[in-house]
């Protein structure tokens, strides 16, 4: 049985002080004393090494103390092969996520094997009052339901979320910028009709204009939709 102390010691062995200082600036809402300073490739390598070990107790030992423990936890969940185990561990972990990095690292592909069930979970997550649960739900909707599985009503899910939280509004902008690249005709109406908050509206336009997937003509049209 691999303990929390075992994993923490292995993370400490991967510590990079220079990276700690850099990463702390990117995640200002996490106290620097709670950042070890482990690069993501090293975390992914450690996760592979841990696949043969029993992590049950560690996964349930929440909340974790360090940023990298949370990020590693997210990587472990993302690589689970069982839908039931993955969903159980994900629901257990989501309420404890307190930063965008640990949130955005997660991509539990196994859940996409049952699209109907996955979508039901996504809808529930997006409606959550917990910032990073809602953000995660939007990211999963963006990643898995803007292509062949797309339905126009999916755009309503993030559009109806009203929040003052920076990291949630940034996710909404990211979602709609991606939707503009993949489903222009459906997504553009949300800007034309001013369906988003002013900040999110303008941030969506900014991110879309920065995208190589948006044509020059579309970018010019978007500039005309910016709210002064």
Regions found by a protein language model. Name each.
Residues 1-228:
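Alpha-helical scaffold domains
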């Amino acid at each position: 049985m691999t303990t929390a102390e075992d994993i923490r010691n292995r993370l400490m062995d991967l510590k990079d002080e220079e990276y700690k200082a850099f990463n702390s600036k990117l995640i200002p809402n996490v106290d620097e004393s709670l950042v070890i300073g482990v690069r993501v490739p090293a975390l992914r390598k450690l996760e592979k090494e841990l696949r043969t070990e029993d992590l049950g107790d560690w996964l349930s030992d929440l909340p974790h103390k360090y940023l990298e423990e949370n990020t590693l936890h997210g990587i472990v969940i993302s690589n689970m092969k069982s839908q039931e185990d993955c969903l159980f561990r994900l629901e257990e972990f989501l309420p404890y996520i307190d930063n965008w990095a640990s949130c955005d690292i997660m991509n539990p592909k196994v859940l996409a094997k049952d699209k109907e069930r996955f979508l039901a979970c996504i809808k529930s997550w997006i409606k959550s009052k917990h910032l990073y649960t809602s953000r995660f739900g939007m990211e999963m909707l963006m990643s898995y339901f803007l292509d062949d599985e797309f339905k126009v009503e999916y755009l309503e899910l993030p559009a109806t979320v009203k929040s003052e939280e920076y990291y949630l509004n940034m996710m909404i902008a990211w979602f709609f910028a991606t939707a503009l690249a993949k489903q222009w005709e459906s997504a553009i109406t949300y800007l034309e009709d001013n369906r988003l908050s002013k900040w999110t509206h303008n941030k969506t336009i900014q991110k879309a204009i920065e995208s190589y997937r948006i044509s020059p003509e579309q970018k010019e049209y978007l500039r005309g939709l910016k709210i002064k």
